[in-house]
Regions:
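Basic, low-complexity segments
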Residues: 1-56
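Double-stranded DNA-binding cores of transcription factors and transposases
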Residues: 3, 64-65
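Short amphipathic helix-turn modules centered on a small-residue break
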Residues: 48-54, 96-103
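Short basic-aromatic helix/loop recognition motifs at nucleic-acid
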Residues: 57-61
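Alpha-helical support elements that line or immediately flank enzyme active sites
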Residues: 68-78
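Anion-binding and metal-coordination hotspots
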Residues: 80-83, 88, 102, 106, ...
């Protein structure tokens, strides 16, 4: 299948809108479809998706902008693939939005969307390039311009995204991995399949082993499952090394068990070797575990960057990772991608993104990073008045304006040890606050630039300007709520990091389109229909 750009859509004399009455045309032009057709659809850049198709002359692809537009509409209305495909031929609003009113036959079938997603996922697995992310960020930037939002003010927040998997006990996890491999070998009619494990292929065996189970039987059943695991791994040899069932069983055995001197497998005891990256459920090998705010989460974490003004906001960037990813790493990744801007951009976040290194990195990109909280204990206020060199390796002056006699920088602690004449320090009004260490001739103080920055931020938190920034940041809390309640982000019908990332991206842009339509309706140019009100 070769790539072809769907850059122009010529209207035919048999166009679906030709038979509409004036009243029907007026209703169509007041609907969401008109604005989608005139602004969103033309902004979809098809060219980056050329790499998904063959260079050889062959049948042309289904228009990429039609596919992406359909996937966005699908998320706006929370439709399944089947519903969007079956609705398109009969709902003129969908055709109008996707510029297909003149098509003799609508270009989507029951496999179009799934195959396109598979192409994008495979390309990302091979190259690490997320074409959908690039497309959505570009669309969101255009929407921000349409809404005339000041992009110099941004805010950031993260949200946990649940994987659609159940919590498994260690017995169930081990049993499921053994059963999956047993069923795979049995289906392959492998003569080496141990006959003693045939019960794993029976439909009721799962319930018999796991649910018809007394608590005192659990240990003996785990022992038996581990023996069965060792037996089936031996029977596999090297023939199943590439199968996911075999790889997952090997993974769970390595993560959950130790080998005794006699070769038998036993469960690991204690939590010393347990970590968040352990397999949670073989149905989603990418899902990880994280405890946050007293709750346990299994799945992923997303980070969203929103630009906003007094009345409007648009999510202009996002990132989707395993849920062991930290907020601090999210802001580092975001700053790495940003070009050095001509004018300063303000980025307001919560305390999870704080850190002196993050502030320094942001400053290099002309981004003023403001966090609404700080990690660690409060420090002495006087530390804010110490002046450091640009690289933070030398104290230039103390709060009284005196230069130190000498400076020694400790690379391990990143602290400067500054020495001042002892009489000078004793006669200083800040002597008690600084609390230097006294020697025979000098008084010394050890201080890191990050500690001085911490003290500066403590002062800043008491200002009216900070209260304005904190109020601005609070607005980003609506994004997790909207994605959960309206776009069902915790109930995505796919598993795996890359697949979930693609779905999440379309939920973000669908949220943005809804905001754009509401913005236009306030201007009197477009009206929301009841379906998306």
């Amino acid at each position: 299948m070769s790539f072809s750009v769907n850059s122009s859509q010529q209207i035919s004399i048999f166009d679906a809108t030709a038979n509409l009455t004036q009243r029907e045309i007026k209703m169509l032009e007041k609907s969401w479809a008109k604005y989608f057709a005139e602004n969103i659809f033309p902004a979809i850049d098809e060219e980056p998706f050329k790499v998904l198709y063959s260079d050889r002359p062959s049948r042309h692809n289904t228009p990429v902008n039609v596919i992406i537009g359909a996937l966005i509409i699908k998320e706006i209305f929370q439709l399944t693939d089947e519903e969007i495909v079956e609705t398109l031929p009969f709902d003129i609003r969908y055709q109008y939005a996707l510029h297909t009113t003149s098509f003799e036959e609508q270009p989507l079938n029951d496999r179009t969307l799934g195959r396109f997603r598979a192409r994008c996922n495979t390309y990302e697995e091979r190259t690490g390039i997320d074409l959908i992310h690039q497309c959505i960020v570009g669309l969101s930037s255009e929407m921000a311009k349409m809404m005339k939002i000041n992009t110099g003010m941004r805010r950031m927040d993260s949200l946990m995204v649940a994987s659609s998997i159940k919590k498994m006990s260690r017995l169930e996890l081990l049993y499921t991995c053994v059963a999956n491999l047993a069923k795979f070998m049995h289906k392959s009619e492998d003569g080496a399949f141990p006959k003693s494990l045939i019960h794993y292929t029976e439909e009721d065996d799962h319930n018999r082993v796991l649910y018809h189970n007394r608590s005192e039987d659990t240990e003996s059943k785990i022992t038996q499952v581990l023996k069965d695991a060792a037996r089936i791994i031996t029977a596999c040899g090297s023939r199943y090394d590439e199968s996911s069932e075999y790889q997952l069983l090997i993974r769970v055995i390595e993560e959950q068990t130790d080998k005794e001197p006699d070769g038998n497998l036993i469960l690991k005891s204690g939590k010393s070797d347990m970590n968040s990256e352990l397999l949670q459920n073989p149905a989603d090998p990418d899902a990880t575990f994280r405890a946050k705010a007293g709750k346990d989460y299994r799945g992923y974490i997303a980070n969203v960057v929103e630009t906003a003004d007094k009345n409007n906001s648009i999510a202009v960037d996002y990132q989707f990772e395993k849920n062991i990813y930290s907020d601090s790493q999210f802001v580092k990744d975001y700053l790495d991608k940003q070009p050095v801007s001509e004018e300063e951009t303000i980025l307001v976040t919560d305390g999870g993104y704080c850190g002196y290194e993050n502030v320094k990195q942001a400053a290099e990109k002309k981004v003023h990073l403001i966090t609404t909280d700080l990690k660690g204990a409060d420090v002495a206020d006087i530390y804010a008045d110490f002046k450091f060199s640009e690289d933070g390796k030398e104290i230039i002056s103390c709060p009284a304006g005196h230069r130190p006699k000498s400076n020694v920088y400790d690379i391990n602690t990143q602290k400067c040890k500054a020495s001042f004449p002892i009489e000078q320090c004793k006669g200083c009004p800040h002597f008690a606050e600084c609390n230097p260490q006294l020697h025979v001739r000098v008084a010394t103080i050890k201080l890191a630039k990050r500690t001085s920055y911490h003290a500066e931020q403590q002062r800043f938190f008491k200002t009216e300007k900070f209260k304005e920034y904190a109020h601005f940041r609070n607005g980003v809390e609506t994004i997790p709520a909207a994605l959960r309640k309206r776009h069902n982000v915790d109930k995505m019908p796919v598993r795996g990091l890359i697949r979930c990332r693609l779905y999440f991206g379309f939920k973000v842009v669908a949220m943005n389109v809804r905001k754009l339509v509401k913005y236009m309706s306030r201007l009197g140019k477009c009206a929301l229909t009841p379906e998306i009100a």
